[in-house]
């Protein structure tokens, strides 16, 4: 297999989301499609595509309205937006970002972080 046909050698291992509402944030993370690996009272671990782990970490106070330190990507942005709306997650309207050839929407998770969801930008090569 040529180098361009192989999976990249690196991946994102962990992303962290601090929360002061562990149970509600855990329900949210499961609802948006992450797989529970471990759920505890102070730390919970969820697996996303590619093996990246999203860690929920309990914190006494969280600044509501702050953007999450990461964003997420989905294969079908419109279907995901519709599903999130049906779950009562109140996604923002989908908007185009022509400078980067993407569409996005945001959702506020229970602790108040705003998470941006992007249309897929995968190259079509193994990942």
Q: Over which residues does each language-model region extend?
A:
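Structural preference for long, well-ordered alpha-helical segments within the folded cores
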Residues: 27-31, 83, 111
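Core segments of cupin and vicinal oxygen chelate
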Residues: 9-10, 16-53
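Conserved short beta-strand elements that form part of the metal-binding/catalytic scaffold
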Residues: 35-68, 114-120
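Vicinal oxygen chelate
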Residues: 1-8, 11-20, 61-127
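A generic local structural motif
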Residues: 2-4, 32, 56-59, 92
């Amino acid at each position: 297999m040529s180098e361009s046909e192989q999976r990249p050698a690196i991946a994102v291992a962990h992303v962290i989301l601090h929360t002061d509402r562990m149970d509600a944030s855990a329900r949210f993370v499961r609802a948006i499609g992450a797989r529970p690996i471990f759920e505890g009272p102070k730390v919970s671990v969820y697996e996303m595509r590619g093996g990246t782990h999203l860690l929920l970490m309990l914190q006494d106070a969280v600044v509501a309205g702050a953007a999450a330190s990461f964003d997420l990507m989905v294969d079908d942005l419109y279907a995901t937006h519709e599903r999130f709306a049906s779950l009562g997650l109140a996604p923002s309207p989908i908007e185009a970002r022509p400078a980067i050839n993407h569409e996005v929407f945001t959702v506020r998770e229970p602790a108040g972080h705003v998470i941006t969801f992007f249309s897929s930008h995968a190259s079509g090569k193994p990942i």
